[in-house]
């Protein structure tokens, strides 16, 4: 396979963090497997996550046909259409994605970009059929057992909601460090090694 393209979305307020280190290892793994990599750092770029009344008013308008509606999200849309692998690097807070990343999904996965709703249809039709793999690289404060009891809503958003807008054979990969609040330095290092190893494989 040649010409693999990975779009990495990083969401953490502090670049100098464990999640920031995971971003570095994510990029290293992807590049080792021959991917061309693009990265968006949502906090550093000052992304506006609030889904506004104007966003709602144009929610079902095909954004491919109305570029004026997407001026502030155009770069993200272009990256989504370019990639075959989407990687989300973020902490898990309150069982889900940080508000910044959830807002990115709300505002960027719009009509004509992530989905279409043709006349007479009873469900959304996927538009991100170029995406054949979705990966989350994340940390959880609590143990895997506690997260399982809480339902892991963030994981379900990726594996059930986002995935259905992608290629019908799209693979998902959840690379997580659980119990990060009490883990050792050795466990953190092992997690970072695992991130790079998993991303170095196709």
Question: How would you label these PLM feature ranges?
Answer:
Residues 145-149, 153-202:
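Glycine-rich phosphate/pyrophosphate-binding loop and the adjoining helix
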Residues 83, 89, 129-130, 162-170:
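A structural motif corresponding to the C-terminal end of an alpha-helix
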Residues 9-10, 137-138, 176:
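Short beta-strands and strand-loop turn motifs
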Residues 1-113, 186, 190-202:
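N-terminal beta1-alpha1-beta2 submodule of the flavodoxin-like/Rossmannoid cofactor-binding fold
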Residues 42, 139, 177-179:
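Active-site donor-binding loop signature of nucleotide-sugar glycosyltransferases
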Residues 116-164:
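Short, glycine-/small-residue-rich phosphate/pyrophosphate-handling segment
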Residues 13-16, 92, 141-145, 179-182:
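Short histidine/acidic/glycine/proline-rich micro-motifs that form metal-
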Residues 1, 78, 126-129, 167:
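Structural motif
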């Amino acid at each position: 396979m040649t010409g693999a393209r990975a779009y990495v979305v990083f969401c953490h307020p502090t670049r100098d963090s464990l999640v920031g280190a995971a971003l570095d290892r994510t990029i290293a793994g992807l590049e080792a497997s021959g991917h061309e990599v693009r990265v968006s750092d949502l906090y550093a770029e000052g992304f506006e996550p609030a889904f506004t009344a104007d966003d709602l008013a144009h929610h079902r308008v095909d954004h491919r046909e109305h570029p004026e509606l997407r001026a502030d999200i155009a770069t993200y849309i272009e990256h989504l259409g370019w990639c075959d692998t989407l990687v989300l690097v973020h902490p898990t807070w309150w069982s889900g994605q940080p508000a910044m990343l959830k807002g990115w999904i709300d505002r960027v996965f719009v009509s004509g970009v992530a989905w279409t709703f043709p006349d007479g249809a009873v469900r959304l039709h996927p538009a991100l059929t170029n995406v054949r793999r979705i990966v989350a690289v994340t940390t959880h404060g609590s143990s895997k057992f506690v997260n399982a009891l809480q339902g892991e809503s963030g994981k379900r958003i990726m594996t059930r909601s986002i995935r259905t807008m992608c290629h019908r054979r799209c693979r998902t990969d959840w690379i997580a460090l659980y119990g990060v609040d009490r883990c050792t330095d050795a466990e953190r290092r092992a997690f970072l090694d695992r991130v790079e190893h998993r991303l170095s494989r196709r």
